[in-house]
Amino acid sequence: MQNRNTFSWVKEQMTRSIFVSMMIYIITRASISNAYPIFAQQGYENPREATGRIVCANCHLANKPVDIEVPQAVLPDTVFEAVVRIPYDMQLKQVLANGKKGGLNVGAVLILPDGFELAPPDRISPAMKEKIGNLSFQSYRPTKKNILVIGPVPGQKYNEILFPILSPDPATKKEVHFLKYPIYVGGNRGRGQIYPDGSKSNNTVYNASASGIISRIIRKEKGGYEITIANALDGRQVVDIIPPGPELLVSEGESIKLDQPLTSNPNVGGFGQGDAEIVLQDPLRIQGLFLFLASVILAQIFLVLKKKQFEKVQLAEMNF
């Protein structure tokens, strides 16, 4: 009886352990594959360095264009559109983590002035919601609501990303003023070449770690290669591991030099950054401008009427 209870307890513990392990695996894979911006969020307090460089460029090495469009000026406590465009050739396919080819994902980081933030859902118009689609934005940090990140999302559908932004009101936020402010943006298409820990992804070129003769190339079952390089002087052998994805450029018996490319560069994506300016406009200034324009128009009208009156007087004197 005791042996049966022991067996049941062991069976229950094993089942529970397997279930917990599976859940951890699923959650971990989901968080890694669906949260590329988290790499920057975990490693950097601020995504924009003192030099002006956005840290995403540390992992996405190729330079590509990005564009941002915002209104020239906005009023306080107003929702407006910030449109980020990440252009690329839609026919391109990138190397995925498993070595296969697939479509490119895109992502973006938007660095707004202090006080500007993501518009709450109840302030977004139905027309703007339709433009946004199913995109989900998040703050870079809970304390940095002015820095927004998005991605990775399918580039075929979202190479143009609309951020709904709420402008601050200086009447309620004393640290905000009616001024011209800069806005910074970074956008990438495709996977990066380097992981945050400094290791290479399979979406980059692999170089020889030593000079010598390639004595053996082994193709792995799951893809990728093991390349053995023998030093011609001392016979010392070095093995370079190539993950699935990059295409091999060398063959057995070939003489190579240190840092010579062993593979092609499969990367078709890249990162770009840009900036724009926006004016937080004081409504009183606009009212003052309208009053000034109205006074100018009235002055012109009175001037024309006065001129006509003067011409009539002159004409009457001439007839007299």
UniProtKB/Swiss-Prot annotation:
One of its GO terms (biological process) is photosynthesis. Its cofactor is heme. Gene3D superfamilies: 2.40.50.100, Cytochrome f large domain, Single helix bin. PROSITE patterns: CYTF (PS51010). It is a single-pass membrane protein. Pfam families: Apocytochr_F_C, Apocytochr_F_N. One of its GO terms (molecular function) is electron transfer activity. Binds 1 heme group covalently. GO terms for cellular component: chloroplast thylakoid membrane. Belongs to the cytochrome f family. Component of the cytochrome b6-f complex, which mediates electron transfer between photosystem II (PSII) and photosystem I (PSI), cyclic electron flow around PSI, and state transitions. This is Cytochrome f.
